[in-house]
Design a protein with these regions (language model features):
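GST-like domain detector, emphasizing the conserved glutathione-binding G-site
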Residues: 1-82
Length: 82
């Protein structure tokens, strides 16, 4: 698995769950802050973010090399456990 980008806010419990899973797996990642519900740059309703995650929710991860994206904490945690 290549380096991951985690989109979200650190004070969001689902984002923290994903971050903890990555830390426990010693998987390198980069955190990009996304403001939930905001339609401006850096917001979850901005077209750039909606192109990655059409549901506009956090957390969302992206594989830096392949561009593969996945949203929803449960789906992400299942993916990371494999």
């Amino acid at each position: 698995m290549s380096k991951l980008i985690v989109y979200g806010l650190p004070f969001s419990q689902p984002v923290r769950a994903v971050v903890w899973a990555l830390l426990l797996k010693e998987q390198p990642f980069e955190m990009k802050l996304i403001n939930p519900g905001h339609s401006g740059k850096g917001g979850s309703r901005h077209p750039d973010f909606l192109a990655k995650n059409p549901s506009g929710t956090i957390p969302c991860i992206e594989e830096a090399d392949s561009g593969f994206t996945l949203g929803e904490a449960h789906a992400i945690l299942t993916y990371l456990s494999q």
